[in-house]
């Protein structure tokens, strides 16, 4: 019987995959790739709606998953970062959200199971990727009306629940609520996860990953990491971590803070350094690995991956780094 992610994370540092968007860019896809024949009737541009590729170019998404698994990833994320009715409304494809999530999970699940069967001693897991959406519950998009909100907590929670029910039915091993910039959005997602698990009768670990927006270590909605932890302590959280924001070196002080205070497993998936003036990431896989090595040697993490600018070449540096390394021990696990 395959071990669960909860069992394996206590034994060794797990490797999460890298960026999906960065990998998709390498395929130089055109509008017709995103649209396909099926969505010919949809108005507006669909190029850039990466999640839709699970339906129109599943071969590309599966190829990316395979590259990350070949690189040594223990956990691959579904291509569902924006697969909610809230986010898909901009593309006029919100009615396909359930199907998109089911398709995305199947693409990842089939490959994860294939690689687990090849080497049962290194089981592979699927994390359902849940992004923050393009709306915020706690801030106004209208500078002239601070009280205005683009959507309500209930609307967002319902949208998340629909996504998560499909993920759970599809067979994810965990739900990863990531790139959190608004704690109220995250709380809606946590509530939705709890409701989705009740509705489906399937329980999986809930992982959180926060994005700090400045060198002061606050989220976009203004919370410190300590305040964020206090805001979610009521929930049954498996892991908490940091992603995006900065490169590994710049992210380290915030990771140290999180590792010292959070009673959960700790994750980190930094960007490939900081973007240059053209928005590109210049840091090499070897350079990033050199910075990440400090996380591992200092016992800061349980799960390590990559965010913006990273590819399978970056993730391929990790297996040698984590081999034999001791995972982080939080206060609750000591």
Regions found by a protein language model. Give the residues of each.
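Domain-level signal for soluble alpha/beta catalytic cores
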Residues: 1-332
């Amino acid at each position: 019987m395959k071990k669960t992610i909860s069992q394996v994370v206590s034994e060794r540092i797990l490797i999460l995959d890298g960026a999906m968007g960065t990998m998709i860019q390498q395929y130089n896809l055109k509008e017709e790739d995103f649209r396909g024949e099926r969505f010919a009737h949809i108005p507006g541009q669909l190029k850039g709606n990466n999640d839709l590729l699970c339906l129109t170019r599943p071969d590309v998404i599966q190829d990316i998953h395979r590259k990350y698994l070949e690189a040594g990833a223990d956990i691959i994320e579904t291509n569902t970062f924006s697969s909610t009715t809230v986010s898909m409304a901009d593309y006029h494809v919100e009615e396909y959200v359930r199907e998109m999530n089911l398709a995305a999970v199947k693409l990842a699940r089939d490959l994860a199971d294939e690689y687990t069967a090849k080497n049962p001693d290194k089981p592979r897991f699927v994390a359902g990727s849940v992004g923050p959406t393009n709306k915020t519950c706690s801030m106004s998009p209208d500078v002239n009306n601070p009280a205005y909100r683009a959507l309500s907590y209930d609307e967002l929670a319902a949208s998340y629940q629909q996504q998560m029910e499909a993920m759970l039915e599809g067979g994810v091993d965990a739900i990863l609520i990531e790139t959190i910039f608004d704690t109220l959005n995250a709380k809606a997602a946590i509530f939705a996860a709890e409701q989705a698990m009740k509705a489906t009768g399937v329980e999986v670990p809930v992982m959180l990953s926060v994005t700090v927006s400045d060198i002061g270590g606050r989220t976009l909605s203004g919370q410190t990491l300590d305040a964020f932890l206090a805001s979610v302590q009521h929930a049954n959280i498996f892991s908490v971590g940091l992603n995006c924001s900065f490169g590994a070196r710049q992210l380290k002080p915030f990771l140290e803070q999180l590792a010292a205070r959070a009673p959960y497993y700790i994750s980190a998936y930094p960007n490939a350094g900081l973007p240059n003036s053209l928005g590109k990431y210049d840091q090499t896989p070897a350079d990033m690995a050199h910075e990440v090595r400090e996380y591992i040697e200092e016992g800061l993490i349980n799960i390590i991956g990559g965010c913006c600018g990273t590819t399978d070449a970056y993730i391929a540096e990790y297996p040698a780094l984590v081999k034999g390394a001791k995972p982080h021990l939080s206060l609750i696990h000591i």
